[in-house]
Every structure is written in structure tokens, then in C-alpha cells.
């Protein structure tokens, strides 16, 4: 198993720059290029420009795929990662806006059909129903979608994200659903809408304490702390609605050790069971666009 994950390192670098529009991002990239003229930088700027052309044509899905391909390049320099991560964020936003326009005039039934078509690739469209009034959504449609929550083949992150959406749709409030956790190999009966986030008090306290402890350990390392939070999010998803059977201080310390090594690209000790748990949990969710669910 790989234990120097470039994807996570790239994510850390991408957190450092934020742009609100394509023009300012393009100008910043050009300025960087004028001060750092290399054959490799010129090549990736040309790739960047080709993606911008797709954006202007409103071919956002193709632009998204091209951008993700570039970010998967292992020899990407840190500044380039920042530019392409920022570009991907802008494209993702426009892609959502484009989908919303297409969905605006659809009935609830049609939207659910789209959610379940090309399964499981369009499950994220369920989030469009969150903004709708309760009267727009037919509660009986829930029965058509509950199989998603017990699909043994579905990635845990996708199942969890789908559950979170169902839990926030007013029309489904007080309906009971069965949720399967593949890591725990357990089924849980949960009442939708009963709690904003259905966990036991013990589990809520566990993650609250874990976040607090990790924050203290990374007090002077805000960027690394963001990565540590990603790990906590991954653990929350993988063990939902429960939590890891570990002592909080021990887990926080292991998260700190792991992130500290990854940031400087050192090999981590996979013989340590807690470190292996962290790595396995992250790799279980590798199709996640880190920080955002596609």
C-alpha cells in the first residue's frame, strides 16, 4: 500500500490559494509564469488555458474531468497544484449552477428518476430537494430510494452523504430507514429528521473531544490541521453512527504523527494498528474530492 499519498499533499497546497473568478486566477497564473519560466510550467499553463476554453463554452463537466486529470499528475509542483485546485473549485461551482438550472422546472418524481438513473453516479442530485418546500416532495418516493442505504457495494462516503440529504428533507421527517455500515458490518434503524445529526451522546462527545485535542496539537500549523480535520471527517463517515473504539488522546496523537510525516513526505509505520486504521480509512474514500462530495 502507498503511504506517501500525493493526493493528500496536493490538497494541503491547494488550501493556500483562493480565487473568486476565472480572470483573477488566470492573471495570477500568468504572473507566476512570467517569474518562473520553465518548459514544464509552460506546458501546464497551456493545459490550464485549454480548460479555460472549455469553461467559456460552458462545457463544465469536460473541464472538470480535464482538471482532475491534471491534478492526478504526481510531479505537479506546489504552485501549480494551487492554481489547478482553485480552477477545479470554480468549475465545480459552475457545474452545480448549470445542473440547478436544468432541474428548476422538473417535478419531484423526475428529479428522483434522475437521482437513480446511471446508479450510483448521480446520487448527489438528491441535494437539490433540500431547498424545496415539504409540499413539493412526495413522501412515498422515499421507499424507492432507501435501498441506497443498504447497498453493500456502495462506497461508504456516498451512502453517508445520501443519508445526510434524506435526513434534511422535511417531507421524510419521522420516517424510519435502515442504514448499513460496511466497516462495522452492522445495520442501524434511524428515524429521519429526529436529530440534525443522529449519533449517541457518547459518540458526539468522542468526536468533539477529538477535534479539540487535534486543534491543540496543531495550534501553530493551520494548514496541517485542515488535513487532520479531513481525517476526522473520514473516521466519522466510516464509523457512522458510532465511533472508533480507541482512546481519544491516543487517536489524536496518532493523527498528529501521521499528518506530520505526510507533510514532509516521510514513510509512515503501517505496522502500527492505529496508523493503519487512519490510512485504510482515507484510502476507502479516495474517490472523494477532498473537502467536497461530488
From Swiss-Prot:
* Residue ranges of the TM segments: none
InterPro entries annotated for this entry?
A: DUF3196 (IPR024503), Uncharacterised_MG237_central (IPR023402), Uncharacterised_MG237_N (IPR023403)
Write one Pfam family the protein is assigned to.
Answer: DUF3196
Q: Where is the signal peptide?
A: none
Q: What is this protein called?
A: Uncharacterized protein MG237
Q: What is the lineage of its organism?
A: Bacteria, Bacillati, Mycoplasmatota, Mycoplasmoidales, Mycoplasmoidaceae
Amino acid at each position: 500500500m502507498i503511504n506517501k499519498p500525493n493526493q493528500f499533499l496536493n490538497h494541503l497546497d491547494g488550501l493556500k490559494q483562493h480565487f473568486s473568478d476565472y480572470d483573477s486566477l488566470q492573471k495570477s497564473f500568468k504572473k507566476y509564469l512570467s517569474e518562473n519560466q520553465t518548459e514544464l510550467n509552460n506546458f501546464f499553463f497551456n493545459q490550464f488555458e485549454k480548460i479555460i476554453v472549455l469553461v467559456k463554452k460552458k462545457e463544465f463537466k469536460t473541464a472538470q474531468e480535464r482538471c482532475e486529470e491534471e491534478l492526478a499528475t504526481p510531479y505537479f509542483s506546489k504552485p501549480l497544484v494551487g492554481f489547478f485546485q482553485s480552477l477545479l473549485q470554480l468549475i465545480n461551482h459552475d457545474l452545480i449552477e448549470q445542473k440547478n438550472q436544468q432541474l428548476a422546472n422538473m417535478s419531484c418524481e423526475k428529479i428522483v428518476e434522475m437521482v437513480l438513473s446511471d446508479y450510483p453516479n448521480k446520487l448527489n442530485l438528491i441535494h437539490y430537494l433540500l431547498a424545496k418546500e415539504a409540499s413539493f416532495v412526495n413522501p412515498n418516493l422515499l421507499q424507492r430510494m432507501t435501498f441506497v442505504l443498504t447497498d453493500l457495494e456502495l462506497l461508504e462516503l456516498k451512502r453517508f452523504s445520501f443519508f445526510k440529504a434524506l435526513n434534511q428533507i422535511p417531507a421524510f421527517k419521522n420516517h424510519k430507514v435502515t442504514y448499513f455500515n460496511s466497516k462495522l458490518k452492522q445495520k442501524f434503524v434511524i428515524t429521519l429528521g429526529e436529530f440534525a445529526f443522529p449519533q449517541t451522546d457518547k459518540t458526539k462527545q468522542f468526536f468533539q473531544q477529538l477535534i479539540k485535542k487535534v486543534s491543540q496539537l496543531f495550534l501553530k500549523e493551520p494548514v496541517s490541521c485542515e488535513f487532520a480535520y479531513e481525517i476526522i471527517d473520514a473516521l466519522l463517515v466510516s464509523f457512522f453512527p458510532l465511533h472508533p473504539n480507541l482512546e481519544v488522546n491516543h487517536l489524536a496523537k496518532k493523527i498528529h504523527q501521521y499528518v506530520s510525516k505526510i507533510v514532509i513526505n516521510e514513510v509512515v509505520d503501517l505496522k502500527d494498528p492505529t496508523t493503519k486504521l487512519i490510512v485504510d480509512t482515507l484510502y476507502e474514500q479516495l474517490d472523494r474530492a477532498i473537502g467536497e462530495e461530488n
